[in-house]
Design a protein with these regions (language model features):
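NAD(P)+-binding Rossmann beta1-loop-alpha1 motif at the extreme N-terminus of oxidoreductases
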Residues: 1-52, 58-61, 87
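Alpha-helix C-terminal capping/helix-to-coil transition sites in glycosyltransferase folds
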Residues: 65-68, 186, 238
Length: 257
């Protein structure tokens, strides 16, 4: 299978390593050709210190790598998802499955990121969301991690599950793409609040109170917006909330501090 990952941030790079480890013909694309050339030479990404990228991973700044791809992973920052989708659109075929791994909601439109991608690629192919408690720093060193592959089309969700699953990266499937994406976006607000708690010197009792009541609120909002209550109690919801609110790797938590 040919897989292409768009975005050389920490998460995009870690994702590309998973796919490469699984034996797929894998390409990692950067919008900056100079950065791509440097990474190809050193086999390292400064955002994932200590991780040596597989020699089999093709690192490039040429969008032509998208031709014939079976799987395309959209991994830019959330603000760049629409622009990245515009760039990928001409290369996609009906057979291609696009995986959105960025988290957030588009400013101005309030669209979920799979919706943004769908608009730009004119829904020519299926879009799946892959989300969960998955800091790139840990996936990069192959720490056991679990995520949820979500799409109303169960076949597409399982295709992504099969592409990513290995002995350190476990993938569950869900038909609730709305809930999975909302959970991944909304927990960031709570992580900021937990950072504020740390900055003010509040301890574990306070943060447990905040996280628990916040998840109840996120669940109610998510249900109103079309998500399933069950989703918010699982990996994509509570799991992601816990890791983002407590981890030393969490940028949102650090920003709150």
């Amino acid at each position: 299978m040919k897989a292409v990952v768009l975005g050389t941030g920490g998460w995009g790079t870690a994702i590309s390593q998973i796919l490469c480890d699984n034996g797929h013909e894998t390409y990692l694309w950067s919008h900056n050709p100079a950065k791509a050339a440097e990474m190809a030479k050193t086999r390292e990404n400064p955002l994932l210190k200590g991780v040596i990228l597989p020699e089999a991973l093709h690192i490039t700044g040429d969008l032509d790598c998208l031709r014939g791809a079976d799987l395309v992973v959209s991994a830019p920052p959330s603000f760049a998802v629409r622009e990245t989708a515009k760039k990928m659109a001409p290369y996609l075929a009906e057979k291609t499955v696009v995986v959105s791994v960025s988290k957030g909601i588009e400013r101005d439109t309030n669209l979920r990121l799979s919706q943004v991608i769908g608009e730009e690629i004119r829904n020519i192919c299926k879009v799946v969301a892959l989300s969960g408690p998955s800091h790139a720093e840990e996936v990069g060193i192959r720490m056991p991690t679990g995520c949820v592959s979500a799409c109303p089309d169960v076949t597409a969700a399982r295709f992504v599950q099969d592409a990513f699953m290995n002995d350190y990266f476990r993938v569950y499937t869900s038909g609730d793409i709305v809930g999975v994406e909302l959970a991944g976006a909304l927990k960031n607000v709570i992580a900021l609040s937990c950072g504020v708690c740390d900055g003010l010197g509040y301890q574990d009792n306070t943060k447990a109170l905040l996280m628990t009541r916040a998840m109840a609120e996120i669940t109610r909002l998510g249900e109103k917006l079309g998500g399933s209550r069950q989703t918010f109690g699982g990996l994509a919801g509570m799991g992601d909330l816990i890791v983002t609110c407590t981890s030393m790797h969490s940028r949102n938590r650090r920003a709150g501090i």
